[in-house]
Each structure stands twice: as C-alpha cells, then as structure tokens.
C-alpha cells in the first residue's frame, strides 16, 4: 500500500484570488509544512504563526504579519510519499575538525544550535530555526550515532539551513568573498562537523560502494574542461563539499544536460565508501547517497549520448592512499 503524506501549498499568482488565471501553487518548506500540519491536526489551532505570515485555517488563507490586506489562498494536499521526484542536489561547506570531539559532543551540538539560531535570524526564518533547534535539543545528550542521524535528517530537509550551507559552500576558497564565507565558520562549522563526523566514522552498515548518479547543468566551457582533464597526466581531483547523489539513474537524469556516474574503485577501507542515507532522509524515495568532503576521484572519460542528448562524465572514487 502506498504511504501518504500531507503537504501545504500557497497560491503564487500575481493576483491570487483571480479566477481568470491558471492557478500556480508553491509548496511550503519542509519545516513550515511540519509546523502547519501540527497546528492544524494535533493542536487543533484556528491559525498558525510563521516568520512572515500566519495561516487562517478556517478561511484557508495566508495573511502577511505586516499587512493584513496581503492575503493568499492555501491548500492542504494528500500525496503519495513515493512520488517519482528528485530534488536538486544539495551541498555543505567544509567542516571544522575538533580533536576533542569524543568528549565534547554536547558542547558541539550547543554551538550548532547557537549558530543555527543566529543564521535563522539573519535569514528571517526564526520559526524554522526554532524547530531545527528543538530537534537538536532532543539528542544533545544522546550517543554520537543518534546525534549524527538527527543531523542527517535535518540536512535532508528543504529548509533555510541547507540553502545557506549550500550558498556558503560555493564561496569557499573564493578570494573575492573570503570575508563572507569565513564569517560563517563559527555559525555553520559546528553543524557541518557533526555531519562530517557521522559520515566518516559512524554507522558502517550504511556504507555502500554502489554506482551512483548525479545530474547537472554544465556550460560548454565546463564540459570542455572535463574533457581536457581526461587527457592530462593527472586526472585526479577531490570533492570540497558534501555531494548528494542517487542510486537511481533515471531520477538523476531528470536534471540538467549532464549526468555524472560515480563508481568506487576498491573497498580498501570504510573511509573510501559512501553513505546511503535514504533510511535516515526525509525523502527516502530519492535513494540518496552522500559523499563526504575530501573524497578523491579520477575523471575517466566524457561521452555524449545522442538518444538522450546528454553528456555523461564517468568518475572513479579513490581512497586517500591512491592519490599519492
């Protein structure tokens, strides 16, 4: 039997109450959905207050907190949880490594909480930040495994947190934006480290060397660069971020004009493997495999599939010892 779930949407048309236009609906973020549904179903509230607006359940409208005249219809939809969809891949900045992590897990979680609270305020997403913090508070005195599993789940959600981490990742190493990404180390670093630690050392049962796939939209210049590297003496490179892939090729092919195909060369060490996080993710149907920062790979070849009109770039994941 197909499992069902509830999602809330707001009408995004320029004139949201017009009956002459085709309706356009935008989905609330994962955390907003959770807050809304809990207020509607569990708490039986007449309304729920979010960061920028509140929702009147009786009239099914979203109302601006700053201007009550700004209203939009909302709707509650029951969908199949295993719908065939795959979200855009998400990224993470390089983490800070604490040598005393074994004895400081509670302190690290508390630092992550403070950082998320700060970033939530900057983004105007205090409600989302509060919800995320509540989840971390529940596990801060638990085992490393339970803390890591919570962080994986939070990372898998559509929220301001992963978007800010994604944006920061793009700036790392960019001298023109050095002040920006360095300013995020204190606030985003602790949460990034919790993720990194779990992926590196915990839950070996989730390790996998299966072939995984990732869709991307590349320019002609970027594709040419990959082709150039395959002809160079050293085709090895490394991931600077957390990289999300899927075990499902068909789903990955939904995105962009290019498909990356990742294959692990050897099972020489658990550190060379990748983690299947589908059982921990909010979206298990995506069949997500997460590759941690620092993983090295070789660019093997670049091909063009005429039938699908896509470039396919084949990469082999290698261990640290193979990069020397």
Predicted segment positions?
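Short solvent-exposed strand/turn elements
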Residues: 307-324
């Amino acid at each position: 039997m197909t499992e069902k779930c509830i999602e809330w949407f707001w009408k995004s048309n320029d004139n949201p109450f017009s009956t002459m236009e085709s309706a356009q609906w935008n989905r609330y973020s994962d955390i907003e959905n959770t807050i809304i549904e809990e207020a509607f179903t569990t708490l039986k509230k007449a309304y729920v207050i979010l960061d920028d607006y509140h929702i009147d359940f009786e009239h099914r409208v979203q109302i601006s907190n700053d201007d009550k005249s700004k209203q939009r219809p909302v709707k509650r939809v029951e969908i199949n949880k295993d719908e065939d969809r795959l979200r855009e891949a998400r990224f993470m900045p390089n983490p800070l490594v604490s040598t005393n992590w074994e004895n400081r897990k509670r302190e690290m979680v508390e630092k992550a909480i403070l950082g998320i609270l700060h970033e939530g305020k900057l983004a105007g997403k205090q409600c989302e930040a509060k919800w995320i913090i509540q989840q971390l508070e529940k596990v801060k005195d638990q085992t490393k495994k339970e803390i890591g599993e919570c962080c994986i789940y939070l990372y898998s959600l559509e929220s301001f947190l992963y978007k800010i981490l994604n944006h920061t990742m793009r700036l790392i190493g960019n001298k023109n934006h050095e002040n920006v990404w360095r300013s995020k180390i204190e606030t985003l670093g602790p949460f990034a480290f919790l993720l990194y630690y779990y992926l590196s050392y915990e839950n070996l049962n989730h390790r996998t060397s299966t072939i995984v796939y990732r869709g991307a939209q590349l320019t002609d210049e970027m594709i040419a660069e990959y082709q150039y590297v395959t002809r160079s003496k050293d085709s090895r490179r490394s991931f600077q971020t957390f990289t999300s892939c899927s075990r499902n090729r068909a789903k990955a092919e939904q995105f962009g004009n290019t498909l990356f195909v990742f294959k692990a060369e050897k099972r020489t060490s658990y550190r060379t493997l990748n983690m299947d996080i589908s059982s921990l993710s909010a979206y298990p149907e995506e069949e997500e495999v997460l590759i941690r920062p620092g993983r090295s790979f070789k660019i093997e070849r670049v091909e063009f599939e005429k039938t699908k009109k896509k470039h396919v770039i084949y990469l082999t994941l290698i261990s640290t010892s193979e990069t020397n």
